[in-house]
Amino acid sequence: DPAILQGFNDLILQQNIPAVVAAMEISSPINYVGNINARKAPVYFSNNWDDDLFKPNSILDMFSQLTGPKHLDLLAGIHMSAEISGLLGLPGLPWDNVHSWFDYWLKGINNGFMSQPAVTMAVKHTSDTTTFASWPSSTVATKTFYLGPRAFNPSGKGTLNNSANLVSFTDAILSGLDTLATSGQVPVIAQLLEPVVPITVSMSAISVVNGIVYQSGALSSGIKLRGIPKLNIWITPSLAQAELVVYLYDVDSTGTGTLITHGPVSLHSATPGKTIQLSMELTATAWDVPAGHRLAIAIDTYDPLYSVPTLSLYTVGFPLSAGKQSVLTVQYVN
């Protein structure tokens, strides 16, 4: 399709973006939820946690808006990796469920599929699954961590705290070089292998010049993350264009962080030197952080998975004070 090719080229060259978005809106199924609901059409979703083409966040959003019969499986892997077994003639959960779905809705076979919970989430790096009767779910709670400044902390890290920050300080990072915080050194390959080869980093090795880390204390009871982590953060970019990539880590007693999820945000028309508040989502996840481990976020300005909005050097300040609270919120189950 020439229109799709033109849109792809425009994205690469960062031009005609409003026109690209408008063109893509036409083919986005979330814009037809009203029609689907009016027909009460049954909808089955299968999606993977690290799918960078169809993020689970958007799937969860659409799923939550549907009012008719629906089912969602969120599995480990990247785009199509959980489904590829069926293409090879091998068994797999998505294909088994698709057959059961069609048997029920097209053949009228009462196979009990619709009596199952509507949402199944594979817990990353385990063989466990979590089920929910619906999404959003009343069984999912939210926990807030308040960012505390790095300032002159001997550890070189900021903090994630249970109570509001009362210290006034502005930390800053410089663009131009990547840090060891990454979604994977080799895009696609790293994400493909991630279910069996976790992406890890020594948290103390993340550059304090080009990145910043905020870390919690040891968690006394652990936490079972289920859903979408969100970061509301105050920043001061020195240029109109900038990029931030936020990584969420499970940090063990040795200081090694295992990547849980991440999320990027690009600025294209900021006012240089003006402090703004960013609200961003990280990619949805299901992850069990053991007791005694810590949660941490690392922030830098580059990741090999994403193009950058500018090649010029810039700084990003992170002002914190009693009047400017930056917070990380995570969804979890007991």
Regions found by a protein language model. Give the residues of each.
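Accessory cap/linker subdomain of secreted extracellular hydrolases
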Residues: 1-38
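Catalytic histidine neighborhood in serine/cysteine hydrolases
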Residues: 66-81
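Acidic beta-to-alpha connecting loop that harbors the catalytic carboxylate
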Residues: 49-51, 77, 302
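C-terminal, loop-rich substrate-recognition/catalytic regions characterized by aromatic stacking residues
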Residues: 81-82, 87-334
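Short, conserved loop/helix-junction motifs that constitute active-site signature segments
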Residues: 36-39, 65-67
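Short beta-strand/loop motif that positions the catalytic acidic residue
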Residues: 39, 44-47
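Conserved alpha/beta-hydrolase "acid-adjacent" motif
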Residues: 52-58
